[in-house]
Amino acid sequence: MARYTGPQCKLCRREGMKLYLKGERCFTDKCAFDRRPFAPGDHGRDKKKLTQYGIQLRAKQTMKRIYGVLETQFRRYYETASRKSGDTRENLVVQVERRLDNVVYRLGFAVNRTTARQLVNHGHVLVNGRKVTIPSYQVRPGDVIEIREKSRDILPVKNAIELNKDKNTMPWLTVDYENYKGTYERNPKLEEVIDLPVDVQAIIELYSR
């Protein structure tokens, strides 16, 4: 699956907000967005009034960049969400929250989703005792996610746990840091994903045009 490999900090500057794509660095004075809080490029400082379409497009781009998903897969998530019963906004959020790389990040085994994706790609993550190397794998309620025993001493995992062990876990997850495992208990409600700075309704309106 293709993925974005360019500078992460430029994405935050383009969206005009911190997306926390680099973990701990985003909270330090090394954060590029804090030093240059304007879009990259020669005209980055220019203030532009967005049209309704522009607002919708920015919402979509922001959500894609937060979860590290490119357009083809993100549209597929929308199409799946729109076919399901219930609130399409919540269905879309559930689709991206169920990604294995996202769940590894949410459990606190990685400082950001990029590192979580690498952990999955490199075979460090088990789902229900079996190795899964597909970051977009859709985790289901009741699935147990753990770090392989041979991988528990690698620095990114140990640093992430040290950073996250005293933080509250999202309410749809439970985590056991002593045993390097966690459980995806249920799908999240839209209002529970409090760190998503996106108007999801704008994305739905964009795709349904």
Swiss-Prot record:
Keywords tagged on the record: Ribonucleoprotein, Ribosomal protein, RNA-binding, rRNA-binding
InterPro entries, per database record: Ribosomal_uS4 (IPR022801), Ribosomal_uS4_bac-type (IPR005709), Ribosomal_uS4_N (IPR001912), S4_RNA-bd (IPR002942), S4_RNA-bd_sf (IPR036986)
Domain S4 RNA-binding stretches: 98-164
SMART domains per record: Ribosomal_S4, S4
CC terms in the record's Gene Ontology section: small ribosomal subunit
Disulfide partners: none
GO MF entries: rRNA binding; structural constituent of ribosome
CDD domains linked to this entry: S4
One of the protein's GO biological processes: translation
Signal sequence annotation: none
Entry superkingdom: Bacteria
Function: One of the primary rRNA binding proteins, it binds directly to 16S rRNA where it nucleates assembly of the body of the 30S subunit.
NCBIfam families the record matches: PRK05327.1, rpsD_bact
Family: Belongs to the universal ribosomal protein uS4 family.
Description of how the protein assembles with itself and partners: Part of the 30S ribosomal subunit. Contacts protein S5. The interaction surface between S4 and S5 is involved in control of translational fidelity.
Protein name as catalogued: Small ribosomal subunit protein uS4
Species the sequence originates in: Thermosipho africanus (strain TCF52B)
